[in-house]
From Swiss-Prot:
Residues engaged in binding GTP: 13-19, 41-43, 306, 332-334, 414-416
Species lineage: Bacteria, Pseudomonadati, Pseudomonadota, Gammaproteobacteria, Lysobacterales
Gene name per UniProt: purA
Protein name as annotated: Adenylosuccinate synthetase
UniProt KW keywords: Cytoplasm, GTP-binding, Ligase, Magnesium, Metal-binding, Nucleotide-binding, Purine biosynthesis
Active site, per annotation: 14, 42
Binding-site list for Mg(2+): 14, 41
Cofactor(s) needed for function: Mg(2+)
Catalytic activity: IMP + L-aspartate + GTP = N(6)-(1,2-dicarboxyethyl)-AMP + GDP + phosphate + 2 H(+)
Amino acid sequence: MGQSVVVLGAQWGDEGKGKIVDLLTEEIGAVVRFQGGHNAGHTLVINGKKTVLHLIPSGILRDDALCLIGNGVVISPAALIKEISELEDAGVEVRSRLKISPAAPLIMPYHIALDQAREKAAGGKAIGTTGRGIGPAYEDKVARRGIRIADLHYPPQLEELLRTALDYHNFVLTKYLGVEAVDFQKTYDEALAFGEYVQPMKSDVAGILHDLRKQGKRVLFEGAQGALLDIDHGTYPYVTSSNTTVGGALAGTGVGADAIDYVLGIAKAYATRVGGGPFPTELDDEVGQGIRDRGAEYGASTGRPRRCGWMDIVALKRAVAINGISGLCITKLDVLDGMEKLKICIAYEYHGKRTEYAPLDAQGWEECTPVYLEFPGWSENTHGITVWDDLPPAARAYLRALEELAGCPISIVSTGPDRDHTMVLQDPFA
């Protein structure tokens, strides 16, 4: 049987998953996206050249890798076409290697209109979505009024589905949110055109994955966002609209639990978060700004500045537990270079008591005060180091502390944005 590895974020997203996925795909049969949409922004830097992917799996830059988009992903036709075009203009062959589940839901124009109008109406209480229609598309999926890739090839059925959806959503848009209605004919024509475009890429993703496993091929499941943004297990309601945890890899592709051999959790050497929601270790001072500047902590999809803070072991241990993480990858270690002191949150003060467990609701998280352990920093440059013993002693001690406190071994350490700026201590596929 082949080996299957799930790569997912162990924090609030933006952990550097794209680079690690690309690193692990040197001898891969397939890379599959299983949740989220084009709100993800996976940045790859190879030989100094930067590529940002939003929908297409990060394995696309490997010539022999098959790239799959599972049923758990919501697809923006415009975003997919744009991304394919940009890659092909750069000389990357995409369409012959990209396979998309016919069960994948579409992000329609009314989803985008709803998302943006709701965020505007919410004002200061906004969740902080990317405004790209992700949440409303998932809502329609659950409400069984979503339009999927498969529906595009049956025009009468598509027309009926679209009229039903627009009757519902245009009422909300015009009567409740006070914005313009979405035009039926324009939306219908665009959907039909996309159906023709995507037809050659439509495939039974679950069937492909089962066949690859029988053939002994390696498969990598590429998560988007992070475990603490999971719709069920995250800081609800400040979460994304899909299951970003390991269960999403199963439901979002059509494989069983026995198909997963290793779960790799990606975490920065510190912590970041975009948008609203609790963040106990946030540094709203010059230290946080320094981390933001050195780490270039601005969203790949939105350009929004990320909130920065110290590593939160309480949150990380929760991610390890709910995902059954086999090993951790710590990224952006080099961002901490030159800092005199470092802190790791090892517990919370919550209602006058110390706890090592995260609350199950956002309000509870907001009421937590971090309890820190302090560690000496290092003045040496770790950028690009690929050998463990070449790291400064203080950096090694910091990583060993993370490993011990999280109760999970560190498999990979990243010391820069390039594919080669990485040390693999334990190969997830070995």
